[in-house]
Amino acid sequence: MAHKKGTGSTRNGRDSRSQRLGVKRYGGQVVKAGNILIRQRGTKVHPGNNVGRGNDDTLFALIDGIVTFEYKTKSRRKVSVYPVAAE
């Protein structure tokens, strides 16, 4: 007879990798063309001036400039990138 109890195995201990969604560059930050501004599912925030939208609704800068968050309408937000004024 066994003198030790057999240890049972657990069926827990797995979880899926999070999707790392959210705002990646905030208002007032300087960005380069191609920088990802927001990773999102659906168009929570819409693309504004000089901002492109990827197949997965990711928003990215089309030009070098400063990020600004604005409202298209009362409830619809957009993000734009405006060029830095040359001094």
From Swiss-Prot:
Disordered, as annotated region: 1-24
GO molecular function: structural constituent of ribosome
Alphabetically ordered keywords of this record: Ribonucleoprotein, Ribosomal protein
Keyword RNA-binding belongs to the record: no
GO biological process, one term: translation
Presence of keyword Secreted: no
Xref: NCBIfam families: L27 (TIGR00062)
Protein name: Large ribosomal subunit protein bL27
Gene that specifies this protein: rpmA
